[in-house]
Amino acid sequence: MSADDSDKYPEDSGRRRFVKGVVGGATLAGVGAAGAATINSATSSPGAGGGATQAWAIENVAGPAPRGMPMIPIEIDGDGFIKGVWPDVKEVKQGGLTVKLAETENYKGSGVTYSQEWYQYCGVESYKGLQPDLETDNYLRSDASPAYQWQKDTYEEGDKLNINDFDQYKTWGNGFGDPGLGQPATGTWRSQNSDNTMPIQVIRSPIIEKLANGGGDISDQTRKWIQAATAKGAIAWLDKCTHFCCVPGWKQTSAAAKFGSPNWVYCPCHQSMYNPFSIVQTLFIARPRPD
């Protein structure tokens, strides 16, 4: 990257925008129901599902990425293991055919329709893990090469992530950015016995905990979603950059400070940045699953 590229993402947006993101999410901007219908009619493609899709995401705050990365709602079982929730599978009519779709309306009373279409971009729509009725346990599992020393010391590849291992989440730091914002891990979801890996990132954070418990200046709609989709301060998302599909990371490199904030999620491919503590709605065209 040339020195001129640094001018694209001014440094003064760093700490200020991070603080702004901590205290508030945003609402879906500028596209109403009529617009969504128009998009749907103009982008029909062969295959199952797809089209205009609203998803909750961590906010894209800098760089060329067009939108945030979609959240994965999570639950914690009785033993502390973290599970990504998969929507209910149903049959729908599409183009005269009956196809299966994983979709849950009014997810946990949040008013949100949670759908597998949130993840149908960057080729993920063709992954085995996006098969609606795939038999899998849905646990979030540690990946092969974690970026964090604590995770390397705790897990082998394929081990299920456990909330009890994130016990330093109020103080953890690794020299990048501010300590005490949360304790992270990387992993996979719905990817066992598959040639394609769905990468995920998890952070257990006192900031998310505060937002779920009524703190912070966010909308009621945003808070309901955070309460429904996070657990014990832990948040997860599909870790596929919405620009060119690379795998970003939180507190994995000092380069994040140059292009926005060391407290943001940074994609090393083209310097897109995401604020994991600013939860927003996005609208995009989900790609259809292959027939």
Protein language model features and the residues they cover:
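A detector for short metal-coordination/catalytic motifs
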Residues: N263-W264, C269-D291
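N-terminal pre-ligand scaffold of iron-sulfur
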Residues: G35, I39-K240, F244-Q252, D291
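Eukaryotic short linear interaction motifs
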Residues: L28, L211, F244-C245, Y274-P276
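Short linker/helix segments within small regulatory modules
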Residues: T253-P262
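Short alpha-helical basic/polar micro-motif
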Residues: R16, D239, V265
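N-terminal secretory signal peptides and thylakoid transit peptides that target proteins
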Residues: D5-A29
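N-terminal intrinsically disordered, acidic low-complexity segments at the extreme N-terminus
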Residues: M1-S2
